UniProtKB/Swiss-Prot annotation:
UniProt protein name: Ribonuclease H2 subunit B
Keywords: Acetylation, Nucleus, Phosphoprotein
Residues modified as Phosphoserine: 293
Subunit structure comment from the entry: The RNase H2 complex is a heterotrimer composed of the catalytic subunit RNASEH2A and the non-catalytic subunits RNASEH2B and RNASEH2C.
GO cellular component, one term: ribonuclease H2 complex
UniProt function note: Non catalytic subunit of RNase H2, an endonuclease that specifically degrades the RNA of RNA:DNA hybrids. Participates in DNA replication, possibly by mediating the removal of lagging-strand Okazaki fragment RNA primers during DNA replication. Mediates the excision of single ribonucleotides from DNA:RNA duplexes.
Species lineage: Eukaryota, Metazoa, Chordata, Craniata, Vertebrata
Record Gene3D superfamilies: 1.10.20.120, 2.20.25.530
PANTHER family, sorted: RIBONUCLEASE H2 SUBUNIT B (PTHR13383:SF11)
Organism: Mus musculus (Mouse)
Length: 308
């Protein structure tokens, strides 16, 4: 666990992070922190999100925040309100590069990478080009040409879908290895009724893994991946959860059964035929003369009349 400071807060707000051990060890060896927090475009939404880059090990981490109500941290001699817990988890930088490759791919031409990964809103995106083995990774999602010792790239939809399929399969293996039960989660996210949930367990894993990968790619690409994986679409009638509101109508409602056949006479007959318990038999033998009926205690009182 490590603590950090939010430079944007004049009160030096401290943040609590859970980091992999090797990140702290690398910083100690360098005697200087090599961790850099940057704001980059989220590959799913395109909006800004905070990421962590280890400049020493050349690794990218996404930041997940766990928030709980009425929670605070005791840090040394101070109390930090809010109680946010930040997690740094490794992330494939190719997902962030894919955001820019998709944009450039609309032009349908080969371009050098330094002209593709450009963003005035998030200028730190150029740090992604420093990651080792970048060229090998780009082969999974682009077509490549070399002219005068300079390489040019063009987005490839076919290659990208095959690469994402591998990511889905790797996720399925990880889910099974960790004994993650995905059946109920798939039913909830897809609004399937109990009788319509896929009986094929493998399909449930693939559908759930597809949902996880979709958090790192645009909606349009997620839909293309779903078709590529041949995942069946949920029925149109179940696209949205069923409404619980009653349907109102001006027409009179007719009973489907004749409830008048269950009259008082039948009920009394039924009581006579039913067997009495020992306590009921003993109560029946008690002399009830002079006793008031229970109705006398709850009925309307009669007004007394007399001469004045």
């Amino acid at each position: 666990m490590a603590g950090g400071r939010d430079r944007g807060d004049l009160a030096a707000r401290q943040l609590v992070f859970l980091l992999p051990e090797h990140l702290k060890d690398a910083s100690k060896k360098k005697k200087k922190s090599s961790l850099l927090f940057v704001k980059l475009a989220n590959p799913h939404s395109g909006e800004g999100a905070t990421y962590l880059i280890d400049m020493c090990l050349q690794q990218l981490f996404e930041i997940k925040v766990f928030k709980e109500k009425h929670h605070s941290w005791f840090i040394n001699q101070s109390v930090q309100s809010g109680g946010l817990l930040h997690f740094a988890t490794p992330m494939d930088p190719l997902f962030l590069l894919l955001h820019y490759l998709l944009k450039a791919g609309k032009e349908g031409k080969y371009q050098p990478l330094d002209q593709v990964v450009v963003d005035d809103t998030f200028p730190d995106c150029t740090l992604l080009l420093r990651f080792p083995e970048l060229e090998k990774s780009l082969r999974h999602v682009t077509e490549e040409k070399e002219v005068n010792s300079k390489k040019y790239y063009k987005y490839s939809s076919e290659k990208t879908l095959k690469w994402l399929e591998k990511k889905v399969n790797q996720t399925v293996v990880a889910l099974k290895a960790n004994n993650v039960n995905v059946g109920a989660r798939v039913q909830s996210s897809a609004y399937f009724s109990g009788g319509q949930v896929s009986r094929d367990k493998e399909e449930d894993y693939v559908r759930y893994a597809h949902g996880l990968i979709s958090d790192y790619i645009p909606k349009e690409l997620s839909d293309d991946l779903s078709k590529f994986l041949k995942l069946p679409e949920p029925p149109a009638s179940l696209t949205n959860p069923p409404s619980k509101k009653l349907k109102l109508s001006d027409e009179p409602v007719e009973a489907k059964e004749d409830y008048t056949k269950f009259n008082t006479k039948d009920l009394k007959t039924g009581k006579k035929n039913s067997k009495m318990t020992a306590a009921q038999k003993a109560l029946a033998k008690v002399d009830k003369s002079g006793m008031k009926s229970i109705d006398a205690f709850f009925g309307a009182k009669n007004k007394k009349t007399g001469k004045i």
